[in-house]
Swiss-Prot record:
GO cellular component, one term: extracellular region
Lineage, top ranks: Eukaryota, Metazoa, Spiralia, Lophotrochozoa, Mollusca
MF-aspect GO terms: ion channel inhibitor activity; toxin activity
Xref: InterPro entries: Conotoxin
Protein name: Conotoxin VxVIB
Signal sequence, start to end: 1-22
Propeptide span(s): 23-52
Function in brief: May act as a neurotoxin, but produces no obvious effect on ionic currents when tested on the mouse dorsal rooted ganglia (DRG).
Matches recorded under Pfam families: Conotoxin
Keyword set includes Disulfide bond: yes
Disulfide bonds: C53-C68, C60-C72, C67-C81
Length: 88
């Protein structure tokens, strides 16, 4: 009877120590999971909602009109984004 009690206590102790180790390991791996997931969501929304344009004086596709200035000057199949002066 005494040996059975010692074995039960030993098993309970080992189980408790394993649970404590697993909980601290999981806590270290998931630092602020809600903040991280909302940051990932924000990044994915930024990628889908923003359209990048080609800067002035950079090469562009005359058929696509992807210039920030809105004007791609055709240079024989390859275009250059027009430089538009800013209004002061």
């Amino acid at each position: 009877m005494n040996l059975a009690c010692v074995l039960i206590v030993a098993v309970l102790f080992l189980t408790a120590s394993q649970l404590a180790t697993a909980a601290s390991y999981a806590r270290d791996k998931q630092e602020y999971p809600a903040v991280r997931s909302s940051d990932e969501m924000q990044d994915s929304e930024d990628l889908t909602l923003t359209k990048e344009c080609t800067d002035d004086s950079q090469f562009c596709d005359p058929n696509d009109h992807d210039c920030c200035s809105g004007e791609c000057i055709d240079e024989g199949g390859r275009g250059v984004c027009a430089i538009v002066p800013e209004h002061v």
